[in-house]
Amino acid sequence: PPFFFNDTATTVSYTLSLHDALPISTRRSNHMKLMDKAKQAALAAAVKTGLGYLEKDPEVNIPKLMELVDKFVPDGWYESQRNAIRNAIQNKDSNWYKLILRIYELDPGVREAFFTNFIINASLKGSALQEETAEENNCNVPWAILLDPTSACNLHCTGCWAAEYGHKLNLDFDTICSIVEQGRKMGTYMYIYTGGEPLVRKKDLMRICEKYPDCEFLSFTNGTLIDEEFCQEMLRVKNFVPAISLEGSEEANDGRRGEGVYQKVMHAMELLKAHKLPFGVSTCYTSANVDSVSSEEFFDHIIDCGALFVWFFHYMPTGNDAVVELMPNPQQREKMYHKIREYRSTKAIFGMDFQNDAQYVGGCIAGGRRYLHINANGDVDPCVFIHYSNANIYENTPLEIGRAHV
């Protein structure tokens, strides 16, 4: 399952680690391919049936979920992960049990679309097709494609790498659709918008969600453009999840992002929670805000606001005029390493540490190994933080770019 727990049931492995990081040149026999497809089909059936079972009475049926999964999945398949999940969800005092209950407070249609697209399409069905495509073409196939719909932004945050591209670049609607069309053929059903501020293009983004209801779309956003009308659109399309930038207390947040931004973010979260829509928080930690974002108060606050996940990135100076003073020092990074893990095992929110959780995803995931990045000019980067490109989406397809080992 995509969010499978490790053997201690205190942390969660990223969905990106569903299949092991084997060399692309590794070849499997037809028998093994059939076995893998059988596993994927069995898991998909188990997940689909299990989700329907949970809908009837989540609080009563969550502890019984693995009994149902066991009926579909043969002995020995993902056994340690299944046992770890079983141990976690049978404890009603565990943070994971509480997080699952929070998910069942969401709008039912949105929740069903998320489970179907994220678990079945992106992580089970998609994984099998990704592996098959990778072997046939001797290349990496990404689990997720990150793309910048626009370089435009309505804020001017200190140290933001996106500003180095200016504010006039855009991937047009047809180009984004083409990327999604080609990605689906490779088994990629997860698309993540970066920027710029993606919601500058929110009408186009909703049209894309509507056109590809079998894909899940996540967007990093400053949250200031989320309003009542947009919440209604999210309810309509059902497959869009915002990750809202928040960097601690009001003072810490507005010190880098601008005066008044914190209150606008609070308003956006209130709207999303009121409409029972899923969202998370994206936090860039710097030398200036480490104490704020590592505090228990910060975690409790974003949980109260309705966030289901929080994704941490440490500040990385990029570009000629980057503010290097904001880089966290080694002691601050170590502090965040331990704090994120502490709260991940105790709080009803899924915490992720982009730079320091490499152990759960087999190391670096860039270069199409699990993801790649397409900027608003169409340039394809191996990583959102590494702005070097030898390919452009206007000149090559994603598969051709993968074959070139970008």
Predicted feature descriptions by range:
Residues 63-229:
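Conserved alpha-helical substructure of the radical SAM core
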Residues 173-193, 199-313:
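Radical SAM/AdoMet-radical enzyme domain recognition
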Residues 8-22, 405:
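Short, small-residue-biased leader/transition segments that mark boundaries at the very start
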Residues 1-8:
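Right-handed beta-helix
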Residues 20, 153, 157-160, 364, ...:
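Short cysteine clusters
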Residues 21-25, 398-403:
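Short, compositionally biased segments
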Residues 30-83, 87, 254-367, 373-381, ...:
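Radical SAM enzyme [4Fe-4S]-AdoMet core and its adjacent flexible, acidic
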Residues 12, 143, 368, 384:
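Exposed loop/turn and edge beta-strand positions of beta-sandwich/beta-sheet ligand-binding modules
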